Amino acid sequence: MGYVSREDALFKKEVIRTADVAQSSQLWLLDEGHCFRDQMVRFCQMKSSQTSQLAYNLGSMETFMRMVESGMGITFIPELAAMQLCDSQKELVRPFAIPVPTRQLIMITNRNFIRQALLEVLVKEIQAGVPKAMWKLGAGQVLV
């Protein structure tokens, strides 16, 4: 999901298209190597030259959110994070147009994994924190 400052041109849009991202005044991205950053760069089909000219790289999503709230640019946040925002922050959230980027969590172990029961408990705990509607890909969603 896009987190867009009121001063950015994208704030007036109801949904964000990948082509719109390049029109933003400032794009705040996590440092290279963060999987969320890499997935969003791939999804928006940004080249490394674009990210170096357009984006500011730091290590904290919270810092980016404060920058956006103070009127500076756009960043991306996971949908689960958007659910935890207060009303004034939710006003800054813009969903992506179809296709919607979606992330998938997969647990893979060796067939003889000794802590299989522990892994099953972990999976149940993760699922308890994620709305059931997010457990499967929906129409218009694409894995990033």
Annotated model-derived regions:
Residues 3-9, 104-115:
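A bilobed periplasmic-binding-protein/Venus flytrap-type ligand-binding module shared by bacterial periplasmic
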Residues 1-27:
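Flexible hinge/capping segments at coil-to-helix
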Residues 3, 29-30, 57, 75, ...:
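Active-site-adjacent beta-strand anchor residues
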